[in-house]
Amino acid sequence: MTKQYKNYVNGEWKLSKEEIKIYAPATGEELGSVPAMSQEEVDYVYASAKAAQKAWRALSYVERAEYLHKAADILMRDAEKIGAVLSKEIAKGYKSAVGEVIRTAEIINYAAEEGVRLEGEVLEGGSFDPASKKKIAIVRREPVGLVLAISPFNYPINLAGSKIAPALISGNVVALKPPTQGSISGLLLAEAFAEAGLPAGVFNTITGRGSVIGDYIVEHEAVNYINFTGSTPVGEHIGHLAGMRPIMLELGGKDSAIILEDADLDLAAKNIVAGAYGYSGQRCTAVKRVLVMDSIADKLVEKVSALVNNLTVGMPEDNADITPLIDTKAADYVEGLIKDAQEKGAKEVISFKREGNLISPVLFDNVTTDMRLAWEEPFGPVLPFIRVNSVEEAIEISNKSEYGLQASVFTNNFPLAFKIAEQLEVGTVHINNKTQRGTDNFPFLGAKKSGAGVQGVKYSIEAMTTVKSTVFDIAK
């Protein structure tokens, strides 16, 4: 019998009347089960968190940081054990899975240190109005309250930790809703916080069926802030449900790599392949299309093709570069995009092969803007080359996307690179590097349908706190 994992609620590990079985995407093996919470159980989670917040926010930043450092140490200690489970649960290469756990520990440590550095300020009224020179404002940041953190399947530990740590160090309490496929990993993350000795109710987990609690956990009046990573349609729905409450949304992307004629093509090819095919393309920041000057396209396609042909395809425990996609629905969607490109005349440089959820890397040249692959986010190991004749055309195609997460520009002309970066409608532009999240002290954000709000440790702390001003009139 497989293990029954429990939710961490108000300092206790709890089962529910119903459960959800979790299976490995690569093999179909049953990995265990997680509780399927009811709405009444969600009520208890939120009530417990609310009750714990007063004492938690009363602690100093230094005291809260001690708990976070302990949790980070535990994650580092157990990185290989947790990584092995994570690798099976989401079909991620073992080394990458362990790396995700380690990076999460690093984020938690950094968040603890960043919180300790937070400072308030004192303002003098006379700086604006001579008649107010006797007024002084003390400005501080305060926690928003209860943060609902919703993490995605592709980084169920890292993109949980990047929400939890800034929230906790700020004096907030947290309810983590991990993805169904990734929920075991999320509960293992919770074990680290539990062992670190956080006071009961400060950090809690919620697992369950979307049909039962999906909207309920978001709409609940107890929630003060919603921090979500996932698809754009779900993010838009959450935004509607949130009403006037603040939200952080990290959503989809269609990141372009723009390759100019003077670019180092070996460097570009290396970054394109790493950016497009890492974790089988299941990353919001993956390179999802290459906009290349026609005069150098043949050379670049040849270099990229050679590197793609060297990628290994197989199982996560073997550290294969390309592993099975998260489920059959995802693989079917990717296949649909590929067939559309085939039917409309794209050149298949590396042909489509599929075995179950495992899709071998696919490379297309001569993709045109009437093809779905030019615009839709595949979340799979397929990359389209779109040939362009000018910088202006590349910018125009990139900006026509409904998404605006990131872009890359490869060129040795740095004044031109900055000029292009200014015109691209995205949150981040990488020069001579692949699109990617991080480092985690940098701001991370999306324009248009790629998100709302700014992440990055310091920015997340600011987002999950609110400013309070106390004004003294010393003349009185």
Curated annotation (Swiss-Prot):
Transmembrane segments: none annotated. It comes from the Bacteria. Keywords: NADP, Oxidoreductase. The keyword Oxidoreductase applies. Optimum pH is 8.5. Catalyzes the irreversible NADP-dependent oxidation of glyceraldehyde-3-phosphate to 3-phosphoglycerate. Is not able to use NAD instead of NADP. May play an important role in NADPH production in S.equinus. Optimum temperature is 60 degrees Celsius. Its EC number is 1.2.1.9. One of its GO terms (molecular function) is lactaldehyde dehydrogenase (NAD+) activity. Belongs to the aldehyde dehydrogenase family. The active site is at E250, C284. Induction: Up-regulated by the catabolite control protein A (CcpA). Disulfide bonds: none annotated. The lineage of its organism: Bacteria, Bacillati, Bacillota, Bacilli, Lactobacillales. NADP(+) binds at residues 151, 177, 180, 215, 230-251, 377. S.bovis does not display glucose-6-phosphate dehydrogenase (G6PDH) and 6-phosphogluconate dehydrogenase (6PGDH) activities, indicating that it does not have the hexose monophosphate pathway. This is NADP-dependent glyceraldehyde-3-phosphate dehydrogenase. It catalyses: D-glyceraldehyde 3-phosphate + NADP(+) + H2O = (2R)-3-phosphoglycerate + NADPH + 2 H(+).
